[in-house]
Amino acid sequence: MEELLKAIVEHQASDAFVTVGAPITLKVDGTLTTLGDQPLDEKQVADLIAATMSEGSQQAFAERQEANYAIDHPDHGRMRASAFIQRGLPGLVLRRISGEIPDFKALGLPPVMKQLAMLKRGLVILVGGTGTGKSTSLASMLDYRNANSRGHIITVEDPIEFVHSHKGCLVTQREVGLDTESYDVALANTLRQAPDVIMIGEVRTAKTMESALAFAETGHLCFCTLHANNANQALDRIQSFFPAAQQNQVWMDLSLNLRAMVAQQLLPARSGKGRVPVVEVLLATALIQDHIRKGEVHLIKELMGRSTEQGMQTFDQALLEAYKSGLISQADAIRHADSANDVRLNIKLHEHGAESLTESTDFEVE
């Protein structure tokens, strides 16, 4: 285990994959590379997994054939681990977690996210697929809040990724499976712990989504993450959590309590070193709230594109700006676009000295 953790840190890998019949594989800047060419056998993989686990994680893995946990090593830092069984054989994926919480400037995040971190109340959802950096961005937002305000921040995570020290705020971090039985059990008791800010590691069910909305409705600021590719998909996914009879009420609750959605992807840097965050920002202006209340999700992206002066931007606009700034290649900008044709056209307009036009819509962070 020591050698594996050391290799992850030395190569600055984001992930490590351990599976029977293949060499240990690292993901570095989004590209897979193997450590040697010697495939691992079943015993080697099983022994490696056991070496990373606490007694409780070993018991959970034996009972459920799945285990998610964190590794906290004094020399090699923190790792998020997911052990599983595939085709009857053990497997493990490790994700490296930076020891220090990066700030907004280091991450290249839009300035409006500082305003979102300091909101008094409401719901802020960070959206993205696995490995897109949304947990890191959320940790940066919480750290900014922690350093620039006073209050009580409670996080419920599975597992805890970034460890927050007490700065201006008191920070309580609870890990599912270690400090609490489940998200739902922890969230049912959270309001009794007098929080000002609540962070839910991931929304996976209707019940967890209801808790997030309830926290916002009762005057708290709630952050959470959700697996989706963009803001529109995230809204559709929230709708899919609930039966048809509840969906109108869900749209109403979202329209009243949602303050922002931030969707993120990580693209290869044009320099060949590292990756670049590309961020879509949806802010709850009066018009956005009206569309959400009516369930008119299909109208939201166009409005986002016309509201850039207020801090909103679509993925395609963010891709174009990253390309114009020399951060990503033209090929990657087009490949990752929601509308490749629109991005291709705007790149041509830029190269010919023209700019795409935007209209503004009033928005003020409360």
Q: PLM features: residue spans?
A:
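Short, flexible helix-loop junctions that flank or precede catalytic/ligand sites
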Residues: 1-366
